[in-house]
């Protein structure tokens, strides 16, 4: 959703605290402690201002796609292995997201809180799996998770199919790929050149 290194996230958290947009406190986490960040009223105001701005366009950071661009410099075995690894990563990320959804659906979880009208604004925050919950936000969280899981499922499907296809290639520079290349490009054009259903053709 927003790729970034752990170091960058840590610096951003400190910056938010420095701006007065969040507070931080240590809390027990087993035998150790962890930092819990809480948004402040000033932070909520800044968040509302940001949400009123025009969003940036989508950005992709999928190394498997980059490797496809330069696949003619690789052997078929390396290419296929890269495709399989990318599919496996997408599959693992999808499974992790589904696990989160299952937690939301579990008895006593956020959806139960939402449906029973408990743990919302103005009430004591209820915890689930050791974390405070915000059931009143679940409708927008569900939309975000829907987008993420669909994208991950598409990535898994595409890279799995691509690995199966490239596994049968004699080489990555074989002229025999030419007819399939035409079929693929024509299929892309046919699939996406027509106007969306909400936009009638002229």
Predicted features by range, described:
Residues 1, 86-89, 151:
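Histidine kinase transmitter module recognition
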Residues 1-60:
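Basic helix-turn-helix/winged-helix DNA-binding cores
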Residues 13, 87, 94, 149, ...:
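Short amphipathic alpha-helical/adjacent loop interface patches that line ligand
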Residues 17, 44, 91-98, 102, ...:
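Structural signal for well-ordered, non-membrane alpha-helices
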Residues 21, 27, 73, 102, ...:
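Short, flexible helix-adjacent loops and helix caps
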Residues 38, 69, 144:
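Conserved beta-strand segments that form the floor/walls of ligand-binding pockets within enzyme
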Residues 49-99:
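Amphipathic alpha-helical dimerization/coiled-coil segments
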Residues 83, 100-202:
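Charged, low-complexity intrinsically disordered regulatory/assembly segments
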């Amino acid at each position: 959703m927003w790729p970034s290194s752990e170091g960058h996230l840590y610096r951003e958290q400190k910056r938010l605290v420095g701006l007065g947009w969040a507070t931080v406190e240590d809390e027990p986490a087993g035998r150790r402690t962890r930092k819990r960040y809480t948004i402040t009223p000033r932070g909520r105001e800044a968040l509302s201002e940001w949400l009123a701005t025009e969003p940036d366009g989508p950005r992709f950071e999928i190394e498997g796609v980059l490797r496809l661009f330069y696949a003619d410099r690789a052997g078929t075995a390396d290419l296929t292995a890269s495709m399989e690894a990318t599919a496996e990563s997408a599959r693992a990320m999808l499974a992790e997201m589904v696990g989160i959804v299952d937690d939301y659906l579990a008895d006593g979880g956020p959806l139960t809180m939402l449906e029973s009208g408990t743990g919302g604004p103005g009430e004591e925050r209820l915890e689930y799996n050791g974390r405070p919950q915000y059931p009143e936000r679940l409708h927008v969280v569900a939309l975000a998770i829907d987008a993420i899981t669909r994208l991950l499922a598409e990535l898994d499907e595409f890279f799995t199919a691509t690995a199966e296809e490239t596994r049968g290639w004699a080489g990555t520079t074989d002229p025999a790929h030419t007819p399939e290349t035409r079929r693929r490009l024509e299929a892309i054009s046919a699939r996406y050149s027509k106007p969306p259903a909400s936009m009638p053709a002229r």
